[in-house]
């Protein structure tokens, strides 16, 4: 498989065409951004870590029957994935109060929720990726009610698999963001990535943060935090 011309470049990844109409080539970048791109930095090794961690987690999900776009890891920073039409919704599942939800509800960060909360955010940089209701989604016409139901169900299923998997590594899955795509056959499958860029991950005992909050809040060395997650998941750390 060959990497051809660049199709798209986002904050964290570049997407390239391949000679297969059904596949695209993903390259993870070393860029870190926060606050809708207002805070930016190049962090050497971050792309490798996100690629390695996403590979491990997508393989885990595929093992239990969850359909994803992941095909294979091509290098330390690259992977081959199925081409899909991305649904312009970020699906956020929350198990513990943190970040914007803690502020929105006026409740203490770290409060464990009795059951997970699923939220939808409209993917639009100009609007700041706003929180939307199912009624808003219908007005925006970006997903049908049936698709929204599938997104919610898949998010909750993935959540339970990841909660258990991270718990075995002594990590608490606080919350995480997913993106989904539609195949040419009309099936909804998991796309994008699952990494410390898209999850809040805390040590189950100390609540030490191993995610992008380290960068957002200037809590320490980002690559050290991501390396710790990779090590606990059984990947090969470069520390």
Curated annotation (Swiss-Prot):
Q: Which GO terms describe its molecular function?
A: ATP binding; phosphoribosylaminoimidazolesuccinocarboxamide synthase activity
Q: Which reaction does it catalyse?
A: 5-amino-1-(5-phospho-D-ribosyl)imidazole-4-carboxylate + L-aspartate + ATP = (2S)-2-[5-amino-1-(5-phospho-beta-D-ribosyl)imidazole-4-carboxamido]succinate + ADP + phosphate + 2 H(+)
Look up the EC number in the record and give it. 6.3.2.6
Cited InterPro entries: SAICAR_synt/ADE2_N, SAICAR_synt_PurC, SAICAR_synth, SAICAR_synthetase, SAICAR_synthetase_CS
Query: From the record, what ranges are coiled-coil?
Result: none
SUPFAM superfamilies on file? SAICAR synthase-like (SSF56104)
| Biological or metabolic pathway of the protein | Purine metabolism; IMP biosynthesis via de novo pathway; 5-amino-1-(5-phospho-D-ribosyl)imidazole-4-carboxamide from 5-amino-1-(5-phospho-D-ribosyl)imidazole-4-carboxylate: step 1/2
GO terms classed as biological process: 'de novo' IMP biosynthetic process; cobalamin biosynthetic process
Keyword ATP-binding: yes or no? yes
Keyword Ligase in annotation = yes
Q: What class of enzyme is it?
A: ligase
Question: What keywords are annotated for this sequence in UniProt?
Answer: ATP-binding, Ligase, Nucleotide-binding, Purine biosynthesis
Q: Report the family membership.
A: Belongs to the SAICAR synthetase family.
Name of the molecule in the record:
Phosphoribosylaminoimidazole-succinocarboxamide synthase
Organism of origin: Bacillus thuringiensis subsp. konkukian (strain 97-27)
Upper lineage: Bacteria, Bacillati, Bacillota, Bacilli, Bacillales
